[in-house]
């Protein structure tokens, strides 16, 4: 979350940051340069991809890999419109175990994503319910910023905004937050004590 400070974002507010190899999200409230509140949400891009793989296997009886799931997630998902598209992909037949081609639709991808997106929304709502009134008022005005690769899912900001009842905005620097966070740790006095050099193993 420390890496989300950029010119396009306020110096304080709630941020939903995907990290840890896309396995988790870190939902935090920050006042530069400090992170005041942080909560781990065990949902990230990896879980979204696995959900697409699992639902496709159950409904279409053929298996696809996580890389294919990631591609169709970006190509077919849309949480704001009733998108009607499909892609032909290669996978493995669930009965014979042989390579095959199959069709994955946008409706299947959206269905697979919604449970994870809803879980993120519910966790954020629970956190907002426990925030002091002055912070809650600030969030209602400034909104929440989302970063990480899942920000590329079309209309995820609008979907979460309807669920949360506050503005949700996408960071323009979703793919650089880890690097920028390391920069914050190194260059800011309040965070510098958390930085250390990793010793090489002998």
Task: Please give the residue ranges for each predicted region.
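Phosphate/ATP-binding catalytic cores across multiple sugar-kinase/actin-like superfamilies
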Residues: 112-140, 185-189
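Glycine-rich phosphate-binding loops at beta-strand->alpha-helix junctions
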Residues: 77, 81, 136-160
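Conserved phosphate-binding/catalytic loops in two-lobed NTP-binding clefts
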Residues: 158-183, 192
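Conserved phosphate-binding catalytic cores of ATP/NTP-utilizing and phosphoryl-transfer enzymes
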Residues: 1-17, 183-187, 191
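Gly/Thr-rich phosphate-binding beta-strand-loop-beta motif of the actin/hexokinase/Hsp70
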Residues: 8-35, 83-84, 154
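Short, charged, intrinsically disordered terminal tails
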Residues: 187-202
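Phosphate-binding glycine-rich/basic clefts of nucleotide- and phosphate-handling proteins
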Residues: 31-118, 129
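Residue-level signature of catalytic and energy-coupling elements of molecular machines
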Residues: 18, 52, 124, 146, ...
């Amino acid at each position: 979350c420390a890496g989300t400070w950029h010119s396009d974002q306020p110096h304080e507010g709630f941020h939903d940051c995907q990290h840890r190899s896309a396995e988790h999200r870190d939902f935090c409230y920050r006042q530069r340069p400090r992170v005041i509140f942080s909560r781990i949400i065990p949902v990230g891009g990896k879980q979204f991809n696995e959900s697409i793989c699992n639902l496709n296997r159950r409904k279409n009886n053929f298996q696809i890999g996580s890389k294919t799931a990631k591609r169709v997630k970006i190509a077919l998902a849309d949480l704001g419109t009733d998108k009607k598209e499909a892609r032909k992909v290669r996978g493995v037949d669930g009965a014979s175990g042989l390579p095959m081609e199959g069709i994955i639709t946008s409706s299947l991808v959206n269905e697979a994503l919604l449970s994870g997106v809803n879980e993120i929304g519910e966790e954020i709502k629970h956190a907002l319910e426990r925030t002091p009134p002055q912070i809650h008022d600030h969030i209602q005005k400034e909104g929440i910023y989302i970063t990480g690769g899942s920000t590329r899912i079309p209309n995820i900001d609008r979907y979460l905004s309807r669920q949360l009842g506050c503005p949700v905005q996408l960071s323009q620097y979703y793919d650089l937050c880890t690097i920028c966070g390391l920069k914050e740790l190194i260059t800011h006095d309040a965070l510098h004590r958390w930085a250390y050099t990793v010793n090489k193993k002998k």
